[in-house]
């Protein structure tokens, strides 16, 4: 059956290559894996296996000029940092971030919503200004989540338990943020919680499949991709559940709600934005993909960093004991701001282990001429090589070294904080459309790591040659090791959390 479908797809790809793959390109260097005499289609097929090396080679050779990478189903124009500095304030009608994200995340299969920045408005206008009022709610739900996800250790055995660190922090983050996104009535619904976490896993596994085979293949064969099928069913369940909640709230307008679903309902401008199914879809998409998955990845990286260095772990634990002298129940926005060592580690961990090689992904909608005369053309997809820039020793001293307290040397100023977006901290994006949820993410990571440090000891179940479980590199994406097993046990002297 697959062969019957593979033949027409193969013919389409061959025609695409003949028509487009051999067209003369504009005069910027193309970074290739294979000799120029061979067809570029071979470079596209092998991009995922060699992406990190190709990006690094292109950056080192053409640091101050654009260069082209041949991805499976697109050309990516990699622009230098000075171009991003010029383009940082350009609006989305000229440089489109939404469609770029749609393409990069197999949007036709994963059904990422296009055409609206409603979620950005909700975070910028409602969530971020309300952080002082929102954080106590988040912390209360996180307290409940720890009781559900980790054993209380009241049997006196104090035994080590085996956990998958990614799944552990994914579940904690899902439970804590659900209350901020869907409110009290639904946030502890176990089916909703499991569906949301599973949707996150299935969506990103589908995206990984797409990056291996290309959007065309993935879209054509989506019905046979198990993770895509499961994610579609989960989306329908959430649309029914949250869509019904939107309609219920409209019928009971005297009720007061203060969550992401409600903010989007109130801020929706167009008829399409206001549809209950669209509101539900957007809430699930942002919750599972933009919040839960990325937070869980960052937390897993940080946990591995601490596990691989006992002195680092103990130094961070002492900081927590000094900041929260009577236990985790004292945690507040101010105490989290006082966690300077942890904040520095978070930023350094993300610098070395970002979610990918690139940020500032955009599709060009209008011709733009840069200061040196180079023109961005409509239809191009552009990005900046954030990992290469932030590990460049000409821009940052000893940039190749992992120094967890590197940013303490800057006296903990706002510009060196984890959540700051700048030319030295590019992985939250850059400019007008930098990640709006980075502030709540920072508090979430600190709250979870703080409690783990104060109340649990942890170590790897098995040794790795480098002591730290190696990252999983898939194309230009970087993931924490999801196969490593961590052992946890409660520390004997901890403050009981009610």
Swiss-Prot record:
Pfam families, A to Z: p450 (PF00067)
Gene3D superfamilies: Cytochrome P450
UniProt-recorded name of the protein: Cytochrome P450 monooxygenase ltmP
GO molecular function: heme binding; iron ion binding; monooxygenase activity; oxidoreductase activity, acting on paired donors, with incorporation or reduction of molecular oxygen
One of the protein's GO biological processes: secondary metabolic process
Pathway info: Secondary metabolite biosynthesis
Glycan attachment positions: 420
InterPro entries from the UniProt entry: Cyt_P450, Cyt_P450_E_grp-IV, Cyt_P450_sf
The protein's required cofactors: heme
Residue sites binding heme per the record: 435
Enzymatic class: oxidoreductase
Nucleus as UniProt keyword: no
Stimuli inducing this protein: Expression is down-regulated when the stress-activated mitogen-activated protein kinase (sakA) is deleted.
Residues in coiled coil: none
Job of this protein: Cytochrome P450 monooxygenase; part of the gene clusters that mediates the biosynthesis of lolitrems, indole-diterpene mycotoxins that are potent tremorgens in mammals, and are synthesized by clavicipitaceous fungal endophytes in association with their grass hosts. The geranylgeranyl diphosphate (GGPP) synthase ltmG is proposed to catalyze the first step in lolitrem biosynthesis. LtmG catalyzes a series of iterative condensations of isopentenyl diphosphate (IPP) with dimethylallyl diphosphate (DMAPP), geranyl diphosphate (GPP), and farnesyl diphosphate (FPP), to form GGPP.
Keywords in alphabetical order: Glycoprotein, Heme, Iron, Metal-binding, Monooxygenase, Oxidoreductase, Signal
Family: Belongs to the cytochrome P450 family.
Signal sequence annotation: 1-21
Source domain of life: Eukaryota
Protein EC: 1.-.-.-
Species of origin: Epichloe festucae var. lolii (Neotyphodium lolii)
